[in-house]
Amino acid sequence: MAASTMSVCSSDLSYGSRVCLPGSCDSCSDSWQVDDCPESCCEPPCCAPAPCLSLVCTPVSYVSSPCCRVTCEPSPCQSGCTSSCTPSCCQQSSCQLACCASSPCQQACCVPVCCKTVCCKPVYCVPVCSGDSSCCQQSSCQSACCTSSPCQQACCVPICCKPVCSGISSSCCQQSSCVSCVSSPCCQAVCEPSPCQSGCISSCTPSCCQQSSCKPACCTSSPCQQACCVPVCCKPVCCVPTCSDDSGSCCQPACCTSSQSQQGCCVPVCCKPVCCVPVCSGASTSCCQQSSCQPACCTTSCCRPSSSVSLLCRPVCRPACCVPVPSCCAPTSSCQASCCRPASCVSLLCRPACSRPACCGPTSTQKSSC
């Protein structure tokens, strides 16, 4: 053989896709180079140990290659492998080769976790997990890899598709994008009591199985329930929480910007600026919508931009800049604007108040003494 120098991961075909491994033969060197090694000392490049890259380790089309018959030997990354295991990365699947290209090979394990674990199904890249297994998490599988895959009973879909709420779960239904699990058994246990859904009840219908992209459309069919178990990221339009005055975290700011208010709904605390408290009563249809939310008696410039320090990120009124219009100061329209004190920052509604009754005379012709 010619004396050339190449790394063990070379894809050079001059040796028939075979490179030399150290220690396989007395004539092989320890320098990870091909140095006049006899062909019997060489192995297929995809079976080379670390630091070989999986670009040459696990070609998608190597179904019958020797590298696909030895990738499942017992190793740290595949502790449960058996000799009869067939690596899914060697089959045509939604896990493309690109998801393996940058992963270094583990010792005696060429297939990185992103493409295959012990329990990963090859075609749709949806793992069937047992216990607290975390296989296929942080994988390159997009949500599309799950839309056409039927849910298996007791299946554990990876985070990219739909988390399952178990006793140890802490992020159930967050950033969920599952679409096809509506009637599957794997969706029936989503609302078990857990830290993330402490108020769940047995009759709860998991909304994360219905296009849970955290938009109002995903929740319109969910009925409101007292202490409802719908995750914060995807509250139904009709199930906006009723918040107490001392509550400051009952909902995220995004829950109000795009929701259409129902009659009698309660505006969450996070959506109440000090200078603007929309009252949802009667036939009101504008609460919780994006608006400047200025009280009728304040000018547009009465409030500073939202404070990043404020717990509720709400605007704060400047006492000196709230200039009221005459109709805001008293029950009668004859009140003069100059009769009113500047608005108080402490007032929840930030309303100007009249300083002295004498200023607001019964008629508009009365001279003001302010």
UniProtKB/Swiss-Prot annotation:
Residues 36-363 are annotated as: 30 X 5 AA repeats of C-C-X(3). PANTHER family: KERATIN ASSOCIATED PROTEIN (PTHR23262), KERATIN-ASSOCIATED PROTEIN 10-9 (PTHR23262:SF170). Keywords: Keratin, Repeat. One of its GO terms (molecular function) is identical protein binding. Belongs to the KRTAP type 10 family. It comes from the Eukaryota. The gene is KRTAP10-7. This is Keratin-associated protein 10-7. Restricted to a narrow region of the hair fiber cuticle, lying approximately 20 cell layers above the apex of the dermal papilla of the hair root; not detected in any other tissues. The lineage of its organism: Eukaryota, Metazoa, Chordata, Craniata, Vertebrata. GO terms for cellular component: cytosol; keratin filament. Interacts with hair keratins. In the hair cortex, hair keratin intermediate filaments are embedded in an interfilamentous matrix, consisting of hair keratin-associated proteins (KRTAP), which are essential for the formation of a rigid and resistant hair shaft through their extensive disulfide bond cross-linking with abundant cysteine residues of hair keratins. The matrix proteins include the high-sulfur and high-glycine-tyrosine keratins. Sequence repeats lie at residues 41-45, 46-50, 67-71, 89-93, 99-103, 109-113, 114-118, 119-123, 135-139, 145-149, 155-159, 160-164, 172-176, 186-190, 208-212, 218-222, 228-232, 233-237, 238-242, 250-254, 255-259, 265-269, 270-274, 275-279, 287-291, 297-301, 302-306, 321-325, 339-343, 359-363. It comes from Homo sapiens (Human).
